[in-house]
Amino acid sequence: MAASSGRSQSSLHRKGLMAADRRSRILAVCGMHPDHQETLKKNRVVLAKQLLLSELLEHLLEKDIITLEMRELIQAKGGSFSQNVELLNLLPKRGPQAFDAFCEALRETRQGHLEDLLLTTLSDIQHILPPLSCDYDSSLPFSVCESCPPHKQSRLSTDTMEHSLDNGDGPPCLQVKPCTPEFYQAHYQLAYRLQSQPRGLALVMSNVHFTGEKDLEFRSGGDVDHTTLVTLFKLLGYNVHVLYDQTAQEMQEKLQNFAQLPAHRVTDSCIVALLSHGVEGGIYGVDGKLLQLQEVFRLFDNANCPSLQNKPKMFFIQACRGDETDRGVDQQDGKNHAQSPGCEESDAGKEELMKMRLPTRSDMICGYACLKGNAAMRNTKRGSWYIEALTQVFSERACDMHVADMLVKVNALIKEREGYAPGTEFHRCKEMSEYCSTLCQQLYLFPGYPPT
């Protein structure tokens, strides 16, 4: 009787293995639709650079698109680019439902801009109109304020943006120009040391969906910002940590945890980018509560973050600092003599027991999207003005320009930009970015040097 039972269980096990094998063979034969394969192929490079896999793989596993073994195979690859390539190699072999499940997983993991890219490409291939995205209001391609009261936003009529000068389809495929050996040799001695691999850790914290009593609007275009920054920072040689939709308390806790990571000891710099609604001196969590920016800086100062002492720390704040829209002024005839004033810093170190003391806060540079009291502008398809300008300048000039000078160039780009939304208060609106610095040396990022 026992022997019979054992044979029965063994038979069931063999049948199970045969069924699994048969399912795999069916998937291989009945593969992905050719249009879906072509869509993935046309966007392969963008997907390989921009996909964020940690959560995405779990969704694909839950949908039976990949197996546990496949997930382990992907995760075993070194680096995010190689992992993304491995997933893209597997997807076309995972059956006719794989493409739709992949798009759904992108949407569920807040990578809707990549889903939009795929669906737009697919519609071009099939010669049909692209479906509307539910991730953002695609009827508002012009600039909107980062944190405008509801009564102001209600005036943004969909009848006014057909000829929007701000139209765009999302972040471009980024490339960062590498630093030459000659430039490095000529500048490294007068600059901060930036040789570690990776250059440092970067944290991108993006709040898009808001709850609570503040009635803060969905940050349409915010997904474009964080994806663009993640790509830029990776190309500049940073290990990037990404956090989405955090409450004010969660933001404070995650920033503190990030500041205390042991990896800061063996890297040469650090980046923190905060993308959300805001007011002067504070940035909103998704619960409508404020995190004070001074608290953010305190977490990374010399007293609280000794691992980053004497190392450059970069902060980028994409948020309003008030609710005033900059209407701009008419420029007078004649040459423009406007210049940005310089800012001198003094050394105040004293020796004690032959050990140099440090000021509590130093070696920081912070870029703000707008001036105090003003609103920051954001394009619902291309992302915020500031992040777009920042990405453009850093990708083109990090190879031969230090960070402070690049932020001056960002200011120049923002100064020239003008909103286009006829019939609304945002028509011909302006924005002016700024930065503040306690850097003590020139900060060159030296992208791509030394070659790996």
UniProtKB/Swiss-Prot annotation:
Residue positions where Phosphoserine is found in the record: S157, S340
Keyword Magnesium: no
Biased composition (Basic and acidic residues): 327-336
Residue span(s) of domain CARD: 32-121
Region described as Disordered: 327-349
Leading EC class: hydrolase
Entry-linked Gene3D superfamilies: 3.40.50.1460, Caspase-like (3.30.70.1470), Death Domain, Fas (1.10.533.10)
Modified-residue entries (N-acetylalanine), positions: A2
Molecular-function GO terms, alphabetical: cysteine-type endopeptidase activity; identical protein binding; protein domain specific binding
Residues annotated as the enzyme's active site: H277, C320
Pfam families found in the cross-reference section: CARD, Peptidase_C14
GO cellular component, one term: cytoplasm
Modifications the protein undergoes after translation, according to the UniProt entry: The mature protease can process its own propeptide, but not that of other caspases.
Removed propeptide positions: 2-169, 326-333
Reaction catalysed by this enzyme: Strict requirement for an Asp residue at P1, with 316-Asp being essential for proteolytic activity and has a preferred cleavage sequence of Val-Asp-Val-Ala-Asp-|-
GO terms classed as biological process: apoptotic process; apoptotic signaling pathway; cellular response to mechanical stimulus; DNA damage response, signal transduction by p53 class mediator; ectopic germ cell programmed cell death; extrinsic apoptotic signaling pathway in absence of ligand; intrinsic apoptotic signaling pathway in response to DNA damage; luteolysis
Keywords carried by this UniProt record: Acetylation, Apoptosis, Hydrolase, Phosphoprotein, Protease, Thiol protease, Zymogen
EC number(s) from the headed UniProt entry: 3.4.22.55
Job description of the protein: Involved in the activation cascade of caspases responsible for apoptosis execution. Might function by either activating some proteins required for cell death or inactivating proteins necessary for cell survival. Associates with PIDD1 and CRADD to form the PIDDosome, a complex that activates CASP2 and triggers apoptosis in response to genotoxic stress.
Free-text note on domains in this protein's UniProt record: The CARD domain mediates a direct interaction with CRADD.
Subunit structure: Heterotetramer that consists of two anti-parallel arranged heterodimers, each one formed by a p18 subunit and a p12 subunit. Forms a complex named the PIDDosome with PIDD1 and CRADD. Interacts with NOL3 (via CARD domain); inhibits CASP2 activity in a phosphorylation-dependent manner.
Family per record: Belongs to the peptidase C14A family.
Protein name: Caspase-2
Biological source species: Rattus norvegicus (Rat)
Organism lineage: Eukaryota, Metazoa, Chordata, Craniata, Vertebrata
